[in-house]
Amino acid sequence: MVSPGLDLELSFSQALQGFGLSEQAARLLWLPLPMLLVLVAAVVGVLVSVWLERKISAAVQQRIGPEYAGALGVLQPLADGLKLLVKEDIIPARADSLLFTLGPVLVVIPVIISWLIIPFGQNLLISNVGVGIFLWIAFSSIQPIGLLMSGYASNNKYSLLGGLRAAAQSISYEIPLALAVLAIVMMSNSLSTVDIVGQQTGAGILSWNIWRQPVGFLIFWICALAECERLPFDLPEAEEELVAGYQTEYAGMKFALFYLAGYINLVLSAVLVSVLYLGGWGFPIPVEWLAGWLNQPIDAPVIQVITGSVGIVMTVLKAYLLVFVAILLRWTTPRVRIDQLLDLGWKFLLPLSLVNLLVTAALKLAFPVAFGG
């Protein structure tokens, strides 16, 4: 038995009704809060990731890194953001101003919206939709349109080449990524991220999907890095070849949106790996033991708060371990060529993901208890 956890909307509504508000008014006040919470979580995740990037890259290169903007340079990401905010926003003379402005928006908004389906605990998520995985795949498929639009609208050969590379790379790696996720969906019999984590809570760490889907885990992680355009897959913005790719003509806030989208996507990918393969909010101590030690029923509010808090900590810790690995890979691996990138996606990862899906289906029929039959 697991703790039912917190229902954010119900708890918020009950709290406001306790102050005399009607149920309809409480629900109306709840409507803007999910996006506000998503924005706060995404921005905090970006700030932490940027700071980690600066410090880890400095350690790899035997430097100190930022140290003057706050203790250990923790305020350096804020300084970077403020600098980009006050820079002049320039639109090239012969660029398509509408598409030039719309491109960064189409890149960043789907990534932010995807956070709505991320569970940090049992019912501790903003939107518990039954097709959360499908929505995430659908939102992620919008991003290549914005990248190609930005490259085309800039009226710059480097930008156009970068946009074409970004679209080709995203399409090449989105298919094996989706097939890797389908194997997880097949085992959990659900498209809900909450159900997928719940399916991994039976035997603690031994029930994590990474043990049953090691190949799928590697496919997902490689494809996620390619979708985030991180080294060794940063072909769309290769400085030595394309200046800055589709971002070449961008400055100020529009450039900041690309910067923001890249890091939000990195943290989102790490959290999704945590949810799909590493047990999400699961932690070693069974809830029953904790409730017995505190002499409380398992559905007591204090148990819900403790398990919810620990669940958030476990999800974030697992995610930032993967962010650390991604940053380390960026500063220690060489860039692949565009032909190698496409060959890896179409000739290796796509067939491998299909074989993995078929093997998962066969194992589910042969061993229904172990593979979610």
From Swiss-Prot:
E.C. number: 7.1.1.-
UniProt topology in membrane: Multi-pass membrane protein
Annotated compartments: Cellular thylakoid membrane
Any GO BP annotation: aerobic respiration
Cellular compartments per GO CC: plasma membrane-derived thylakoid membrane
Keywords from the named record: Membrane, NAD, NADP, Plastoquinone, Quinone, Thylakoid, Translocase, Transmembrane, Transmembrane helix
Enzyme class of the recorded protein, top EC level: translocase
Cited InterPro entries: NADH_UbQ_OxRdtase_su1/FPO, NADH_UbQ_OxRdtase_su1_CS
Domain of life: Bacteria
A GO molecular function held by the record: oxidoreductase activity, acting on NAD(P)H, quinone or similar compound as acceptor
Residue ranges of the TM segments: 28-48, 98-118, 129-149, 167-187, 205-225, 267-287, 309-329, 348-368
Catalyses which reaction(s): a plastoquinone + NADH + (n+1) H(+)(in) = a plastoquinol + NAD(+) + n H(+)(out); a plastoquinone + NADPH + (n+1) H(+)(in) = a plastoquinol + NADP(+) + n H(+)(out)
Protein function: NDH-1 shuttles electrons from an unknown electron donor, via FMN and iron-sulfur (Fe-S) centers, to quinones in the respiratory and/or the photosynthetic chain. The immediate electron acceptor for the enzyme in this species is believed to be plastoquinone. Couples the redox reaction to proton translocation, and thus conserves the redox energy in a proton gradient.
Subunit structure: NDH-1 is composed of at least 11 different subunits.
Stated family: Belongs to the complex I subunit 1 family.
Entry protein name: NAD(P)H-quinone oxidoreductase subunit 1
Organism of this sequence: Parasynechococcus marenigrum (strain WH8102)
Gene behind this protein: ndhA
